[in-house]
Amino acid sequence: MQNYIRSIGFSMYKKKNEVKELLDKIQRENIASARISVTTEKERLWEIRKNLSESVGLCIYGYLENLGVFVREGYFPYIKDTSVSSVSKCSIEKHIDDSVFSGMLDDNRLGMSLIFRLSNPLDYIDNTSRKISSVNLFGFCSDGRVLLPIKKTLVEIESSKQRSQDRTLLIEAAKRGDENAIDTLTTDEALLYSTLSDRIQTEDVYSIVDTLFMPYGMENDIYSIVGNILDIKEEENILTNEKILILKIECSDIELGVAIKKEDLQGEPTVGRRFKGNIWLHGKINQE
């Protein structure tokens, strides 16, 4: 987790005792603003949120003991005011050994389930009976790179959008048990694999693959992404004065925010270019 708080401007905090001192200070100075929620098992959970710039902050969380002692369990970064990424079906589960919640999003645009760290767990605890209407996705990156865009004509862009929409519809039909849809998807995948195998012999992979969203490593909420840069904001951590970039990325037709320390991004980010990096994926749920 220490690798990812550098993405919000804490790159000098590399040792556990340094991070502990930072968390102690934030908890001590902001204890009056602590939010407390009670779970259905009568467990009292708390969190303290410290805004560090216009868009990012650090959340410290834990549980209350019987005598009112605040026991800290962990911390995570967050991004505020991100846009809706998906309105697909989403489920939330609590981890067995701590008060961390994860979400699973079934979005057919990706053709797989996305697992993310829930960024607003107390909202969920206070409103468990309310339906989840949408999810705002955002991630944190400690090492990113800017890629040039793939040159496309307007016809190619429209054709790509249509193929993506058709594939989404086929996946929806396949989930309902449509045999024709399953056969079509299988044939398309085989054809795509054959085409890529031929092209990869003479072309760079990032000149073939426009955007990418796939699991990375052993953690289930870490993803490797390649996406188009739609917007860029530069901000400053008020505690460390480190520069932070907040990128709005479109990846496989899904929009999400990505925070990265400015010095950790190789290349000059501009709208229209692409971003490549491994992100720790978080999500804020919106409820009806």
What are the language-model segments listed below?
Residues 214, 233-235, 263:
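Eukaryotic intrinsically disordered and solvent-exposed regulatory patches
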Residues 230-258:
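OB-fold (S1/OB) nucleic-acid-binding surfaces
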Residues 1-43:
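N-terminal alpha-helical "arm" segments
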Residues 113-117, 256-262:
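Short amphipathic beta-strand/extended segments with alternating polar/hydrophobic composition
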Residues 40-217:
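Long, hydrophobic alpha/beta structural blocks
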Residues 280-288:
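Short, Lys/Arg- and Gly-enriched loop/turn segments at beta-strand edges
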Residues 262-277:
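Short nucleic-acid-contacting surface segments enriched for D/E, G, S/T with interspersed K/R
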Residues 216-228, 273:
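Short coil-to-beta-strand transition motifs
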